[in-house]
């Protein structure tokens, strides 16, 4: 199996606006998904011509509101739109939709047969916008009506362990399939699609990201430049930033830039969870050998460490954990970084006629800081 494809979701009001986005990003993606449910009603009547307006394969999707989409016109109207979009197949298959997304409960034999006859591959999808899907292997097998269909499961995880299960189950699914955990906690499933054997990962351009904010897709920049999605393989070293809720962080930018600069096959990404044990189980399964630790886990992570550096023992907090010989070892690089910066800025100096080293200042600073944190709590 090759690397997962990058599919950009198109959610503009008009076909013309969607075409412009395809032209802008076509060198960074492999295919697009036309979300007909986002189009103006007048525009929906002309979706048949869209594949001939672009130079990339296209998925036809008309997502119902119950599945997280905008279409609320009823199944008869939606079926008519599907039929209209797939009709009059062109002998040049590049001018037809390459894929069509049918939900697992959408069973209209005439339209399904037409899609197969025209060479349009069916993605058979199941969406749960409020809960995880537990029986992923069984669900994928039951949705695959023919050998040409691609089962797709997208769900909203309740905790990181649901995402871990997605990776575990993904390895067991036979044939092409698409797996995606939505929302901030599910982001690793989009970045690391290789590790779930997913056929593709969905992204959205920054111009329309607001339209899919609830499911939290990646942007073309994030998938290509920040996480270097196309180069991720089973051999890529994985590292993460453990925290909650991690609304905004520059750590992936800093670390991944460093990996690229020094030619390292590595990827650093956010691991969002309020439960430390879930993160460690996630890391164990994906063979993540190091994590930065930030709020609120710098103290709670101590319980799970097999060893602690002297700095961690003295300060009572940990900001870095490394796995060696199947044991998690905790370090605190905040103290070292502060000490180094202080030495460079002022060196050793005299206070009240006593020479005080930067090391002593750092020790007192972090001890006072930790006490302050406890008092505020």
Language-model features: locations:
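Active-site beta->alpha loop and helix N-cap motifs at the rims of alpha/beta catalytic domains
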Residues: 1-124, 129-133
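Catalytic alpha/beta core domains of metabolic enzymes, predominantly
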Residues: 90, 104-237
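Phosphate/diphosphate ligand-binding glycine-rich loop within oxidoreductases
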Residues: 236-348
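Glycine-rich phosphate/diphosphate-binding loop of Rossmann-like nucleotide-binding domains
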Residues: 349-377
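Active-site glycine-rich loop that binds ribose-phosphate moieties when present
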Residues: 80, 84, 135-140, 337-349, ...
